[in-house]
Amino acid sequence: IHDSCVTRDETSHHESVRWVLDELGYNWTEIERNGKNTRCCGVGGMVCSSNPELYERVYTRRANDFDQHNIVTYCGSCRGTMQAAGKDAVHILDLLFGPKYTKDQERARGYQTEQEMWKKRLETKERLNHLW
């Protein structure tokens, strides 16, 4: 489980995600840097846009904290960075609302860079502004 840095002090979030995984029947392991000690995935402060080289170093370091290939997170940006680092990252909502997931069937998801995701968000906002 990768805990998002913005929830570093939100112990109830950490506990809730782990409870959901337990209730869904998934086996998971803790890593050393989690919860209050979690590391940023690299997206914080829009580093991905302002300093791509630093972004790559930060997300690679974070991904290397995991011995496992499969990572569960509850932040869309964190999921994207873990995928960029070559991990099979799954958002908790995919597990809640999707089919049962096993580590031997890595999902074929289209990977988008952070810049692509932000561009789509901006385009969606502009479309919605025209409606309202």
Where are these regions (language model features)?
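Iron-sulfur cluster-binding electron-transfer modules in prokaryotic oxidoreductases
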Residues: 1-132
